[in-house]
Amino acid sequence: MFNSVNLGNFCSQTRKDRTSEFGDRTGCASNIYLPSCTYYVPEFSAVSSFLPQGPSRQITYPYSTNLSQVQPVRDVSYGLDPSSKWHHRSNYASCYSGEDLVHRDCLPPSTMTEMLMKNESVYSHHHQHHPNSSHPSTGFYTGVGKNNVLPQGFDRFFETAYCSTDNQSEHCLQKSEMNKLETSSQQPTAVSAAREPEKDPEDEEEHTNSGSCTSAATKDGNASKSSHSSTPRTRKKRCPYSKFQIRELEREFFFNVYINKEKRLQLSRMLNLTDRQVKIWFQNRRMKEKKLSRDRLQYFSGNPLL
């Protein structure tokens, strides 16, 4: 009897508990969000989230607001991360064209909340802004700086690095141009200074050996030298010999430094030259060999007085 009474009480209690739990479940079912339903549940905002989070932001979208059941889902997804940790961007950045993304820094200044609450006006402003407007960039796009990779805190390093490389490149270009000008101005003077002593003994030998030079010719030569001394002298091509003629003359000079008359006439007939041309060429070649031997001895001995 006692057991039956207790069982009856237990059964009655369990039935009451079951009915109360079922009532609670039915009450909660009225607050459950069903995406297949077309009605809007106003009690959804009262449901607490299971994760610790900051105050979630309400976002309005440029499309029609008839699909209002999507908004709480967006609200929950944006509320997962703390509001102070990350700077949220618009989800439609991938849908914008390249020009819209390039001119994203030209938006009028406003706070983050205003930008998020007025997303529709921002989207329309992307298509109607003027490229010449120079408004400061807002907090809505503070995640990325000028280098499109690092935050804006690294912009000063980015600018100094680029300025230093630009200045170095410009400085190097200026130095190279100055060096080119200096070398170009010094080269003809050095060449003329090096060729003048080579030319003078040859000219002297030609004038002394030919016997055709007079005092008037020397005066004219001195006058021409004085007139051209101010300008960089470039040695004119005075050699009328061909490569074949020079090769044969050099071969004969290698065997005989001083050529006799018979060999000289033979070379003149073979090379289609005059006797005088062959004789003058050998004289000049001997002076050149003498100068080369002197320079060679000075180079190997190291004595500049020779």
From Swiss-Prot:
PROSITE patterns: HOMEOBOX_1 (PS00027), HOMEOBOX_2 (PS50071)
Disordered: region residues: 177-238
GO annotation, biological process: embryonic skeletal joint morphogenesis; regulation of transcription by RNA polymerase II
Cellular component GO terms, alphabetical: nucleoplasm; nucleus
Magnesium listed as a keyword: no
DNA-binding region, residues: 234-293
InterPro entries per record: DUF3528, HD, HD_metazoa, Homeobox_CS, Homeodomain-like_sf
UniProt signal peptide: none
Entry-linked Gene3D superfamilies: Homeodomain-like
Family per record: Belongs to the Abd-B homeobox family.
Name used for this protein in its record: Homeobox protein Hox-C11a
